[in-house]
Structure formats: structure tokens, C-alpha cells
């Protein structure tokens, strides 16, 4: 017998069944949370919070107070294996009571659920002989500047303003099947700056993907050798300064001895005593100056030695990692100017990455501009952009030669310049339009950040405890990945006819803000499930039908880790 239910969140129905298939619901339910249980478990409330994020809810209260409240939609609750949903206040209390260990345990579930997708995409890339393409960035999550209820919020640069809030460090990855996918997010105070986070971004990407390139230990060995050699002038200066100090102290001692001897002789003229006293004071000042010089050199040498120790420690670590990584992958990282310090550039080079970055030091732009003459041939690379480049340029403070380009472009009537840097085997200086396009393709992460804020509303923090804020960040990037995985899954399992809603042809924004918030009728019996969009919906006349029996899949992508959607439903004709 057919069962029918109405829903105002149509796309959340198949998304719920997809969540069952990949083990998301059972994974969250298995996390131990130290909260009292009344009618609903805290795990169910955490799951409801995720569904709210997935549906593009702007404010937590919209769960109960929106035009079509999520907590009244029993069809969605059943699709997500819940008897019903709870009021938003209960969700808020459950999220507030989460501690850091519990939030991280839930985040680990999301990582575990995601792992088969990463493994599959990495296998595809290996089969195609392609490397990994990463993009990293730091994005601000501002709150009201007058707020005092957000723990550990701090003032920092956010969207060209100084705002109170937090920073989220994110890494995205280009997937051959799904396009942009998020790899990681790390929660930081609002005063965190990009230049301190480059290494953390790379390590987070490597931890999440389980892959890293071959470390360039030969370059690091050469760097250490040159680094030690660069200390030789300072060592010589230190020795000469020690000798100068000793000579000054000896001269002072001799002068004071002469002064004492002269004072014991009654016949000594006052002028002689005055001369010796002045000479002693001069030596005293000379000793003070010599000590300051020696101390300054000693501090520099100590810092230099400590840096050498750090480099040697890095070398040992990288050599060990190369031994433990018999099948390294090739990988590329793109970063904006905030990360482009010489130390960060050197580190990423030594870690084995091909690197595309803008330089952090604005002085290099002025130096490059001085190298340009009226006869310099500029290459047109974009609508309003031109570039000139120098291969393997050795910058003063960078241990490795870089491909350097000076870019000039217009914003309105104002001409601006920036410096791009590249390290890797790609001969970028022979094709500047390709270099320009490759670097600016990092706009994909900027588009991804925009999506998290304008589709999933990450910029509207729905909770005020820091562990819960972190979990909202994690759930938001997971939701962005989840909808992409689910779109392919729906296309593989839905019956295709002229009335089928083309979910795969819809953008993510339309899927979330429209399809996940529109009305439909859910009809099911032994044949399968039919999601028929209502006549009042923008998708009137469209439907999604899933058969209960297995169909030959259109792709084998999910076969290693999915079972077929086991639904009970009826197709209306």
C-alpha cells in the first residue's frame, strides 16, 4: 500500500537517504556525548544542526520560525532516520554543551565518511598520471564589534576591514569527478595572519589526503651548506671583537695601574694624573662599545645556529618521510600574497611542491618596476593585464631562484602592479598567459569561500561556544562536499525520463536555496520512491524516482563502498 507525505524541503529527502548510504547518520549516532537524554538524543540534535546547515538556514531559529519550519517536516526526519525533529532551542542547547573532544570526535566522523571519496579521486588522478592541485586561504568570520559573548574572538583583517571575529584556514582540492572539494578547515582567532599559517595549511592537506610529494632534500642539504658558510664572516667578526674587547680591558687595566702608581708618588704632576684618568675613561667607553658589538654579534650567531639546527632537524625529518613514502605524488599549491614570505616559499619548495604565489614583500615590486625600461616588451595576458617575467631570478632573501613576473593591471583608471613567483618544472616564463591563467585559477577557492558564506551562511555563526563554532565550520565545508557527492549519486540511481529533475545540471546554489526548500509529495511502496514536485513549485511537473531494486549503475565510482539505496516507494504515472 502506498504511503504519502508532503514536504517543503524536497531535495533533503534523497540527501537523507544518501547520508544513510555513506554511514553519516550511524557515524554521528555512535559518537559519545556527555549530555542528558530526554525525548531526543544529543546526537539527533547535532544531526539536525547539520541538516539545517545543508538546507542553507541563515539563523538557527529558522529551524522553527521559518515560513516552512524544518522541525515540522516529518518526511525529512524520516529520510534522515529520525522519528521527528526538535525545536531550535533544544538544538542550540545541545550544541552549546559540546566540548572540544566531542566536536573533534564528530569532525572525525565526517572525515571518515569522506575518506572513500578521497581515495577514489586519488586513484583516478594516479591512473591519469596527474598530480594534486591544492589552493589555500584564510577567510574571516566577523561578528558584531560590540559583542562580548563570542569566546576568544579577536580583532583582525576581514574583507578589507578591521573586525572582531575568527579566521578559518581552508584548503581546497581539485577533483576530476566533482570539481572543487574542501580538504580541511582550521579554526583561529580573528587576529591570525596568513603568513603564519602556510605550513599548517600544507600539513593539514597532507594529513587529510594521506599523500605528499617527494621532499627536495638535495636542495635543503645545499641550503644548509651555504647557510653555514654564510656564518663565517660573523664568526671572524666575533673573534676580532673578542680580541678588541680583551685589548681594551687590558689597556684599561694597565692605565689604572699606572694611575695608582702615579698617585703614590708625591712628585707626580696633576696634569699627568688627569691624563691617565681621561685615558681610563676612554678605555671604559671603548670596553662598553666593544661589549655591545660582541653581544649583538653573539645574539645573531645564536639565532643563526638555532636556525641551522632547525634546518638540520627538517632535513632529518624529510629524509625519513622520503623513505616512508615510496610512491610520492606530484602536487601544486597556489597561495595569495598573504602567504608569500620568503620563509614560506622556501619551506614549500623543500616540501616538494610546485608553487604559484604572489610575493608578500611589496619592495620587490618597486625593484622590478625599476628594472623595466620603455623598451621592455610586455605580454598581454588578460583583459586589462600585462606581464613581464624573469626566469630563475635569485632574490636577496630567498635561498632558491624563482621564476618572477611583474604584472600590471587597471582597476578603473588606476594602474596597479604585483609580483608573481613560481617554482617548479613548468617553464612558465615561456608562456605568460598560461602562467597568469594558472595562478588566477585559484579564484576557485575564493568562489568556494563565497559559496560557504552565501549558500551555507558560514559567516552567520549560529552558535556561541567555540567548540560549536568550530563544528559549524567543519560541517559547512562537509556540506559543500556532501552535496557534490550526492548529486553524482542521484544521477546514478534515479530513473531518467522526460520528467526527471536534472539535478546534475543545477548549480549548488539552486540545489540548496531552491530545490532543498521547495514543496513536493513523497510517495512510496514496494516499487520504489517517487519525489513529485508540487504544482506550486518552480519544478512543477518534475520528479525524482528511485527504484527499490538494483539497477546497473551508470558509473562504477560508488561500487567499492556503497550499497544500493534500499527505498520503499511507488511511481505515479
Give the location of each predicted region.
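N-terminal basic/disordered segments at the start of proteins
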Residues: 1-20
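Anion-binding and metal-coordination hotspots
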Residues: 1-7, 25-573
Amino acid at each position: 500500500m502506498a504511503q504519502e507525505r508532503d514536504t517543503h524541503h524536497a531535495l533533503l529527502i534523497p540527501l537523507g537517504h544518501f547520508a544513510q548510504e555513506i554511514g553519516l547518520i550511524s557515524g554521528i549516532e555512535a559518537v559519545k556525548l556527555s549530555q542528558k537524554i530526554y525525548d531526543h538524543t544529543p546526537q539527533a540534535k547535532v544531526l539536525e544542526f547539520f541538516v539545517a546547515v545543508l538546507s542553507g538556514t541563515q539563523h538557527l531559529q529558522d529551524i522553527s520560525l521559518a515560513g516552512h519550519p524544518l522541525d515540522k517536516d516529518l518526511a525529512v526526519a524520516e529520510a534522515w532516520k529520525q522519528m521527528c525533529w526538535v525545536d531550535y532551542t533544544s538544538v542550540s542547547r545541545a550544541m552549546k554543551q559540546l566540548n572540544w573532544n566531542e566536536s573533534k570526535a564528530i569532525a572525525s566522523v565526517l572525515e571518515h565518511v569522506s575518506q572513500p571519496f578521497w581515495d577514489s579521486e586519488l586513484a583516478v588522478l594516479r591512473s591519469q598520471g596527474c598530480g594534486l592541485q591544492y589552493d589555500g586561504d584564510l577567510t574571516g568570520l566577523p561578528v558584531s564589534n560590540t559583542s562580548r559573548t563570542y569566546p576568544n574572538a579577536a580583532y583582525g583583517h576581514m574583507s578589507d576591514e578591521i573586525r572582531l571575529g575568527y579566521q578559518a584556514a581552508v584548503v581546497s582540492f581539485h577533483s576530476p569527478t566533482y570539481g572543487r572539494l574542501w580538504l580541511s578547515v582550521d579554526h583561529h582567532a580573528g587576529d591570525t595572519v596568513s603568513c603564519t599559517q602556510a605550513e599548517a595549511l600544507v600539513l593539514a592537506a597532507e594529513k587529510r589526503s594521506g599523500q605528499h610529494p617527494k621532499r627536495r632534500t638535495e636542495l635543503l642539504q645545499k641550503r644548509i651548506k651555504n647557510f653555514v658558510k654564510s656564518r663565517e664572516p660573523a664568526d671572524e667578526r666575533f673573534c676580532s671583537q673578542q680580541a678588541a674587547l680583551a685589548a681594551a680591558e687590558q689597556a684599561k687595566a694597565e692605565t689604572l695601574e699606572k694611575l695608582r702608581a702615579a698617585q703614590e708618588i708625591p712628585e707626580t704632576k696633576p696634569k699627568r694624573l688627569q691624563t691617565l684618568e681621561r685615558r681610563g675613561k676612554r678605555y671604559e667607553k671603548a670596553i662598553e662599545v666593544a661589549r655591545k658589538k660582541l653581544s649583538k654579534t653573539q645574539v645573531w650567531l645564536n639565532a643563526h645556529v638555532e636556525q641551522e639546527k632547525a634546518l638540520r632537524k627538517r632535513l632529518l625529518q624529510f629524509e625519513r618521510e622520503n623513505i616512508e613514502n615510496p610512491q610520492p605524488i606530484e602536487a601544486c599549491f597556489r597561495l595569495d600574497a598573504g602567504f608569500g614570505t620568503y620563509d614560506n616559499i622556501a619551506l614549500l619548495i623543500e616540501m616538494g611542491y610546485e608553487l604559484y604565489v604572489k610575493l608578500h614583500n611589496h619592495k620587490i615590486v618597486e625593484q622590478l618596476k625599476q628594472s623595466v625600461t620603455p623598451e621592455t616588451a610586455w605580454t598581454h595576458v588578460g583583459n586589462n593585464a600585462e606581464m613581464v617575467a624573469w626566469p630563475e631570478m635569485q632574490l636577496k632573501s630567498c635561498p632558491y631562484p624563482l621564476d618572477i613576473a611583474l604584472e600590471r593591471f587597471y582597476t578603473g583608471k588606476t594602474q596597479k602592479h604585483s609580483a608573481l613567483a613560481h617554482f617548479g618544472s613548468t617553464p612558465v616564463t615561456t608562456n605568460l598567459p598560461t602562467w597568469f591563467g594558472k595562478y588566477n585559477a585559484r579564484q576557485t577557492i575564493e568562489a568556494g569561500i563565497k559559496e560557504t558564506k552565501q549558500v551555507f551562511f558560514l559567516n552567520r555563526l549560529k552558535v556561541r561556544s567555540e567548540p560549536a563554532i568550530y563544528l559549524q565550520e567543519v560541517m559547512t565545508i562537509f556540506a559543500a562536499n556532501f552535496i557534490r557527492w550526492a548529486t553524482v549519486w542521484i544521477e546514478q540511481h534515479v530513473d531518467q525520463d522526460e520528467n526527471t529533475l536534472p539535478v546534475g545540471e543545477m548549480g549548488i546554489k539552486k540545489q540548496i536555496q531552491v530545490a532543498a526548500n521547495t514543496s513536493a509529495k513523497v510517495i512510496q511502496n514496494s516499487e520504489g520512491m517517487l519525489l513529485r514536485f508540487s504544482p506550486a513549485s518552480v519544478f512543477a511537473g518534475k520528479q525524482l524516482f528511485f527504484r527499490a531494486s538494483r539497477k546497473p549503475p551508470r558509473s562504477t565510482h560508488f561500487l567499492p563502498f556503497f550499497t544500493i539505496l534500499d527505498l520503499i516507494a511507488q511511481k505515479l504515472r
